[in-house]
Amino acid sequence: MNPAEFLSLLHARHCQRAFTDEPVSRDVLEAALLAAGQAPSGKNTQPWRVTVTTGAQRDALSNALCAEYDAGAKPQADYDYSLQPQPEEWMDRARACGYALFELKDIARDDVPARKAHGRENFTFFGAPVHMILHLPAGAERGNFLDAGMFLQNLMLALTALGLGSCPQYSVAGYSDVIRATLGLPANRWIVCGLSIGHPDPTAGVNTFVPDRLPLVDFVDWQQ
């Protein structure tokens, strides 16, 4: 792969929110995970761990999460995702992203059932046949999350290179106790996020959605 092809791969990756039921082979998943494991980490600690679910276990996890969501259970993740209160410019971008996605899916702002169904898709993993759970030791610090983020980005890029789509999901981590109970993970594991993986559905309009990215001038400060 030449430099232009690699840069094109970086630009090509975006969240997929509709998948076919075509299976993903274990060999392909192992290749992607092996590439992800090349991520750097502080003092080579490699703190990340991944639980891969397919088949009946994937379905059991989805069913358990959907049951919590349908019951109106309040999400309670193991860690706070973002700075609070969030800077207004962050909120502006989040709102713009949400509005654009709902417009594409033809979901009106006051259509509560449609919004509820939209949220539920997170827990059906958008139909993906594979769902991975990324976890860290309880009490993990910011640097450990930095390492896990680099691992996750490597993984998503590897999946893209292998012709697969993915969608990272903090929403799933909101029901961390359910995940631990269903997958037999101990209480001393923090759930970082889920990752839905599969072959993107080429007929799904939602998969054309790519949110705007900031221009360099908005996030780079050159100093000489």
Question: Where do the model's predicted regions map?
Answer:
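Acidic, surface-exposed loops and disordered segments
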Residues: M1-Q224
